[in-house]
């Protein structure tokens, strides 16, 4: 009799995806982040579902409903902080996952990579809308500033912004629709994740060397299930440390004040995971130029496979490309720092230089480094 695991139409799919899946024997801990992202998504959907049972998406009661969740609901404070800090863990894993893809040349699986970029956009949109829901000062003004950027689009901009707002300012209609979309998008993301995995399993995983490993594969279970569980424990430890000891470390104190359209906070800034893009947006004095730079800072990931000039896939044996990669990492950390600073000297010029360097590294320095390495191979 055939094992049900291999014969049942539904269980067979799970088996071929997570149990008998052939995986390269050499993949390192940098390959753990895919499974961690899946767990983050599941955690966010679960905690979000329970929060939605107590939250009200009305401007007059939203702020108080969040306070009610924290004070009166059984373990409501824990649900709220797991959800808020879970988003931070989600983005840490996301950025490390994308960084891994860049370093080891995983972007050469073009369908998987492009699907990943779409997922990144979807997660960013979800996180932005979720930040608006507590209806604190930074929620309101963050929503106002970011949605207002669309008014820079020629001809249709103003109409588009008013259409998104559902009126002439961020108000009741905006909050209600943001809650609806914030609830809906994670389920769409779950479907996109399945497509992402479908594309990945067409080719199989990449490995640190970047060399095809078809002749050296091992089953995913038990080897990588055990390895992923270790990563999971480490992530849960980090998340619980945040939630139980420093729940407000990554939040903004302004969000503990109810939204007030008549009082603008001195420094409007998004959550830490958007600061790099916010710094790029602010570094350009022109509104439309800033919006384009903001969009391109993420969209540029799509053209990375086209900018690959090296004869080798991975950066593991390419010292010049490694230098450019770590320069990019340092530049992104600089942008993240600048995004959280006020718009004054010397932060303005640092932000502008870091923004120029960001695009320069990806479009010019990385492809040139690879061409030089090709010449060094001959030498």
From Swiss-Prot:
Single GO cellular component term: mitochondrial inner membrane
GO molecular function: metal ion binding; ubiquinol-cytochrome-c reductase activity
Keywords noted in UniProt: Electron transport, Heme, Iron, Membrane, Metal-binding, Mitochondrion, Mitochondrion inner membrane, Respiratory chain, Transmembrane, Transmembrane helix, Transport, Ubiquinone
Membrane topology, from the record: Multi-pass membrane protein
Cell location: Mitochondrion inner membrane
One Pfam family it belongs to: Cytochrome_B
Residues that hold heme b b566 according to the record: 97, 196
CDD domains, alphabetized: cytochrome_b_C, Cytochrome_b_N
Record-linked InterPro entries: Cyt_b/b6_C, Cyt_b/b6_C_sf, Cyt_b/b6_N, Cytb/b6-like_sf, Cytochrome_b, Cytochrome_b_C_euk/bac, Cytochrome_b_N_euk/bac, Di-haem_cyt_TM
Cystines in this chain: none
Gene Ontology biological process terms in this record: mitochondrial electron transport, ubiquinol to cytochrome c
TM region(s), chain numbering: 33-53, 77-98, 113-133, 178-198, 226-246, 288-308, 320-340, 347-367
Keyword Metal-binding: yes
Cofactor(s), by name: heme b
Binding site for a ubiquinone: 201
Record text on subunit structure and interactions: The cytochrome bc1 complex contains 11 subunits: 3 respiratory subunits (MT-CYB, CYC1 and UQCRFS1), 2 core proteins (UQCRC1 and UQCRC2) and 6 low-molecular weight proteins (UQCRH/QCR6, UQCRB/QCR7, UQCRQ/QCR8, UQCR10/QCR9, UQCR11/QCR10 and a cleavage product of UQCRFS1). This cytochrome bc1 complex then forms a dimer.
Note: Heme 1 (or BL or b562) is low-potential and absorbs at about 562 nm, and heme 2 (or BH or b566) is high-potential and absorbs at about 566 nm.
Protein name, entry field: Cytochrome b
């Amino acid at each position: 009799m055939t094992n049900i695991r291999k014969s049942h139409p539904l269980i067979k799919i799970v088996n071929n995806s997570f149990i008998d899946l052939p995986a390269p024997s050499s993949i390192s801990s940098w390959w753990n982040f895919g499974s961690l992202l899946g767990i983050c998504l599941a955690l966010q959907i679960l905690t979000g579902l329970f929060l939605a049972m107590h939250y009200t998406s009305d401007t007059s009661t939203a702020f108080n409903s969040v306070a009610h969740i924290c004070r009166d609901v059984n373990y409501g404070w824990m649900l709220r902080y797991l959800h808020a800090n879970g988003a931070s863990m989600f983005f840490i894993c996301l950025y490390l996952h994308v960084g891994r893809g860049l370093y080891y040349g995983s972007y050469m699986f073009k369908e998987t990579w492009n699907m990943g970029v779409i997922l990144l956009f979807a997660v960013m949109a979800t996180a932005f809308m979720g930040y608006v829901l507590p209806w604190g000062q930074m929620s309101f003004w963050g929503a106002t500033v970011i949605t207002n950027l669309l008014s820079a689009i020629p001809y249709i901009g103003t109409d588009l912004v008013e259409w998104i707002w559902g009126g002439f300012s961020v108000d009741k209609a905006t909050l209600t629709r943001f809650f609806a979309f914030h609830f809906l998008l994670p389920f769409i993301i779950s479907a996109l994740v399945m497509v992402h995995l479908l594309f990945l399993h067409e080719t199989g995983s990449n490995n640190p060397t970047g060399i095809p490993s078809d002749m050296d594969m091992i089953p995913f279970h038990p080897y990588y299930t055990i390895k992923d569980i270790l990563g999971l424990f480490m992530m849960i430890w980090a998340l619980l440390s945040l939630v139980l000891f420093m729940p407000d470390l990554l939040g903004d104190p302004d969000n503990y004040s109810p939204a007030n359209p008549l009082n603008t906070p001195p420094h409007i800034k998004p959550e830490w995971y958007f600061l790099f893009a916010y710094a790029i947006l602010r570094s350009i004095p022109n509104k439309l130029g800033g919006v384009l730079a903001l969009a391109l800072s993420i969209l540029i990931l799509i053209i990375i496979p086209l900018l690959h000039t090296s004869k080798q896939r991975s950066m593991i044996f390419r010292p010049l490309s490694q230098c450019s990669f770590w320069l990019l990492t340092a530049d992104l950390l600089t942008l993240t720092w600048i995004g959280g600073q006020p718009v004054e000297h010397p932060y303005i010029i640092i932000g502008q230089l870091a923004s120029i360097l960001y695009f320069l590294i990806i479009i010019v320095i990385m492809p040139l480094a690879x061409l030089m390495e090709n010449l060094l191979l001959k030498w």
